[in-house]
Amino acid sequence: MSDTAAEPDALLRHKPDELLRHRPDELLRHHGDVEVESGFVDFAVNVRGDGPPPWLRDRLATALSSLGSYPSAAAEYAAREQVAAHHGRSPDEVLLLSGGAEGFSMLPRLEPSLAATIHPSFTEPDWVLEQAGVPVHRVILPPPFALDPTLVPEAADMVIIGNPTNPTSVLHPCEAVLSLRRPGRTVVVDEAFADAVLGAGESVASQSLDDVVVLRSLTKTWALAGLRCGYAVGHTDVLARMQHGRAHWPLGSLQIEAIRACTEPFAIDQARAESERIDRERTEMIGRLDALGLEIAGPARAPFLLVRVDGADSVRECLRARGIAVRRGDTFPGLDRHYLRVAVRDSVQVDILVDALNTVL
């Protein structure tokens, strides 16, 4: 069978350096949702719950009556105003997005000559930039995956970093992230999981800097993956360039309503409570997995864990046969076939995972 007809699993048995040479588009766009089948116990997708909480469902249901009209400029501004209030920014420094990933699709409009992406991390930025013909330099951080700004080429006029980072669960200090700044360089910080981090979380979203863009997602904490809700905060000139040529009415009324609702004070309090719950569940889960002799990357601060185990690809298949989905790690640059990512879950689901691991390890 030729490479172009080979199955993804066969391709992913190659060494890490070879992964991106075999159908790179497919590998860079491999996400945890493809691991999950109906009825599976899901540790592969980093979304909390099966759907939005009742209060948010009610809010969206009320907004259904507006679907006969085009999304209004007033509603869009009100949502930007609410996001801005949450972060202490101006509404003009907020750009509403159809999911945080849409922000990555806009990065080529900033016309970088060389982009540096910090890995292991989310690979959508690499895919988008390479599709646009932008040279991409992958900076591979070795375990324990702490940021080393000296590894970034000085010539890079765009640097993209996740904080906390998917899949390592590492939270980089704010000072380290800002140390990536250079004259003529734009630093893009993917804070998709920031609202799930207990405490201040080292976010830079509230810092009004003309060379830093922060991308946020509302998908994870609020279980809105199907609605696609997110936003960017950054300098007005940078945001204007990012959305140049964007279609009119880029977000629907329900997306706009969800973004506004999820950044209001009540929702922020709910997210804070959820981050406390995640912190407790993560601590318990680490203890359970550590007792099995698994190596957990850390200190973990996100709602997922990066696990190293010999023969992780075989372990994943054995778990799959038992109706348990975990995220393979070998599609992330810098990781190999001995890594898995598992979402933080409650004790009932962790019991199921641990029982299965006791059998397959």
Language-model segments: residues:
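N-terminal "arm"/small-domain region of PLP-dependent enzymes with the aminotransferase-like
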Residues: 1-70, 85, 155
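PLP-dependent aminotransferase class I/II
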Residues: 51-53, 74, 211-290, 294-297
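Short loop-beta-helix segment that forms the pyridoxal 5′-phosphate
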Residues: 71, 84-106
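Conserved PLP-anchoring active-site segment centered on the Schiff-base-forming lysine
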Residues: 108-130, 135-137
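Active-site phosphate-binding strand-loop segment of PLP-dependent enzymes
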Residues: 137, 141-196
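PLP-dependent enzyme catalytic core of the Aspartate aminotransferase-like
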Residues: 321-322, 333-361
